[in-house]
Amino acid sequence: VDLGFAKSHVDLIKEAMVGVTVEGTSRFVFAGAPYSSGGKTGTAQAVTIGQQDKYDADKLAEAQRDHSLYIAFAPAEAPQVALAVIVENAGFGSAHAAPIARRVFDYLLLGLYPSEEDIAAARKGLASTPIGQQRLASDVPLVRVADPTNNPPEPTASVAATSKASVATATAAE
C-alpha cells in the first residue's frame, strides 16, 4: 500500500523498529522468537507531574499511572500482522504491552498458545519472554464471545501444521 512516503524513509523506520526487538527496549521479550519483528515501545502519562517532581508509580493511584504502549509488525521481511497494544495505567511499554504483542504474534504466526505458567506470570505483571511449554492453539478451546463477529481469528491449517513441527523440535531440544 502506497502511503505517499518515500520508500527510503519507510525502510529507515522499519529498520529502526526491527532494531527495537533485536537490541532495544523489547529485545528480552522477543528473544528466541523464530520470526523477526519490528516494534516501538511507548509510555504515555495519565497525569501531569511537576517539573521538579520525580515520577513514582507506587505513590500514585492506579488511575494516575502511566499507560504502556507498543506498536509492532511481523514477520519483518514480509509483514502479515500489524498491531497496537495499549495497557492502561500499567507503566513502561516494554514491561507490559510488548509481552502481549509477543503472545499475539506467537498465536497468529505460529499457532501457539501461552503456557499456564506464562499466563500466571502475565496476570501478576511479570510477563517477558514466554515461559513454560507453549501449547498448540488448536488444543486450547477458543472461548467465544457474545458477538460472533468479534471473535479472534483462528490460525490457519498451514500455521497449525508448522507449529506442531516447531513444538516437536523445541520439546526435543529441551
Can you say where each PLM-predicted feature lies in the sequence?
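Active-site beta-strand/loop architecture of penicillin-binding DD-peptidases
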Residues: 1-2, 8-115
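Short, solvent-exposed mixed-charge patches
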Residues: 172-174
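Short, gly/Ser/Thr-rich active-site loops of penicillin-recognizing serine hydrolases
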Residues: 1, 98-170
